[in-house]
């Protein structure tokens, strides 16, 4: 199928649901899914966003703004994720444990509204990556219509652009827990530090960024085409000074640049 045939198929899949609650993070995939569902089902669609310390405030703000602009009903559920010691210990299946907890809360939040289905934004590319969280999606019988329609991330961006969505060129985001080495305990204060460090780099004009934490070392990942900018003495000194203030002893640049799931690389070797 070509792109627009896939899009038509997606709309037919959604139409068959009758009504739908969409787990909405504000990212590229869930925004496109939510908009498409709203175009098909109208007020029989509702967005539900989980609020938790793994998600930066800027992501929540953008999710709220999106729903307000599109006039889509939007509710929230609060997830005290670090109350789970199993998740805080950051095992290799953390993503599964976390997703399971989030989906439990989302289902509880949606229950009073009598929606037949809940959908989430996994796409056809996600099966290529280490995604233990998808096991929880399957176990909770959550729908993944983008994946079912065979839409890739690049195709979702293209269709989002055609629909005029502000998220079409939004950089990919992963929860802040992914900045920790597996086995290193996730601490709320460190999440705040990482969020501030990444926001600082965003404010300097860097696009796709991650600040990974290795004890007292900050490992910065950015797109390689921005290396020339970050190694300028005035920029590198400013970054070093700011991250030192945040509590890091050493600040490093990953020479491979940004890549999805770099903390998973050692796991995938096994």
What are these regions (language model features)?
Residues 103, 187-194, 232-236:
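Generic alpha-helical secondary structure
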Residues 118, 147-153, 157-201, 207-209:
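Mid-to-C-terminal catalytic subdomains of enzymes
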Residues 213-215, 219-232:
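A short interface-forming secondary-structure element
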Residues 254-261:
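A short, acidic, flexible beta-alpha connecting loop/helix-capping segment that sits on the rim
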């Amino acid at each position: 199928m070509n792109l627009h045939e896939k899009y038509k198929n997606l709309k037919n899949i959604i139409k068959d649901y009758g009504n739908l609650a969409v787990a909405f993070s504000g990212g590229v995939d869930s925004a496109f899914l939510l908009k498409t569902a709203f175009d098909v089902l109208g007020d029989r669609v509702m967005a539900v966003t989980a609020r938790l310390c793994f998600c930066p405030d800027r992501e929540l703000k953008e999710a709220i703004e999106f729903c307000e602009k599109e006039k889509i009903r939007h509710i929230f559920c609060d997830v005290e994720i670090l109350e789970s010691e199993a998740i805080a210990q950051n095992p290799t299946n953390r993503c599964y444990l976390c997703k399971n907890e989030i989906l439990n809360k989302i289902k509880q939040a949606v229950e009073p509204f009598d929606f037949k289905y809940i959908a989430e934004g996994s796409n056809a590319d996600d099966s290529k990556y280490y995604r233990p969280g998808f096991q929880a999606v399957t176990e909770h019988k959550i729908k993944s219509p983008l994946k079912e329609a065979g839409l890739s991330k690049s195709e979702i961006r293209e269709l989002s652009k055609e629909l005029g969505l502000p998220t079409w060129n939004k950089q990919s985001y992963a929860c802040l827990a992914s900045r920790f080495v597996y086995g290193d305990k996730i601490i709320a204060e460190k999440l705040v530090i990482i969020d501030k460090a990444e926001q600082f780099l965003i404010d300097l004009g860097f696009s796709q960024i991650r600040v990974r934490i290795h004890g007292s070392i900050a490992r910065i990942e950015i797109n390689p085409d921005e290396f020339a900018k970050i190694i300028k003495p005035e920029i590198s000194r400013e970054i070093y000074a700011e991250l030192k203030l945040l509590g890091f002893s050493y600040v490093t640049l990953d020479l491979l640049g940004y890549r999805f799931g770099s903390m998973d690389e050692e796991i995938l070797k096994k």
